[in-house]
Amino acid sequence: MLPHKCMEEHDYPGLRFTLIGTLDGLRQKVKIDISTGDAITPQAVEYRYPLMFEDRSLQIMSYNLETLLAEKLENIMYRGTSNTRMRDFYDIYMLTGKPGIAINDATLYRAFLATSNTRRTTEFIPQFASTLESVESNTEMQKIWNKFCNDNDYVLE
């Protein structure tokens, strides 16, 4: 396992670790990004990650849901139609469309402002609605989305 730089465009680049696990001949890659300097609004949350083959879980500190969504929204706002990260669109759709997932709108708003401020992209906020319209109507974005759907079986579920 070797770390690679990630988020190099930020003032506080992070590291990405790619782990490869094997079980009965099956190989699975797991990518873990570690970064510093992100605005977590209001704070990190404790997350228990249940292990698949043991009766225990790992405790990790993670972004709260609103900060996770804010980072994805900020990326969409900033990159607009040059965004090729379809996973962000999919994640937003899944996280906001599932019953039982509670999103605090006020916290999301504060997290979005904090993320935009940290990334120095607040100047793009007034045009965000028109950026979304451009993304939605852009034929190249639609082609990239269709390819993402075809390449990832889980999208169709």
For each feature predicted by the language model, list its residue ranges.
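Structured mid-to-C-terminal alpha-helical surface segments
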Residues: 1-157
